[in-house]
Amino acid sequence: DATFSVASYFFDDDGVLAQDTKIIDNGILVSGISDTLSALQLGTAPTGNGRRESYKRKSYTRMTNTFFSPGKAKLSDMIKSIKHGYLLAQTNNGMEDPKNWGIQCTAQYGREILDGQFTGKIIAPVVMSGYVIDLLNSISAVSRDFEVIGSGSCGKGYKEWVRVSDGGPYLKAKVKIG
């Protein structure tokens, strides 16, 4: 959603009006994001996601403020329902492998949960990895708690960075951590 949070903008770097683009709705992929060129190639309307680091650079299709919408679950009920797991906090980066549907994200720390209670054990840092489809299919609860922080960035290689916001609700999901 390019119109929400600190990293928002009115027009993308192709001159397209910024908008809220719903990518997944009720578990179904309903849209992607595009800049003007990729939209032309796909035969779709651009979504206002053509962004570049500076006027010296080419625009690329880039994420904006990307997050899950809030759900209905109470965080306390989600924690109580966990036999063994971790509440991960302060995610600070992630990357995807679009060819193989892989994903990797990092959180500053995780608080261990055993039989629905925090044990006091902290692990840090936490790297989550897996297959996007498996992760999305494993989501069993989405909290009503919702927070978006405008301190992120989206990179394309070592020189192409644009500001984004991240965050959202808590998700109860199965992921591989290490």
Regions found by a protein language model. Give the residues of each.
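N-terminal small-residue-enriched
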Residues: 1-178
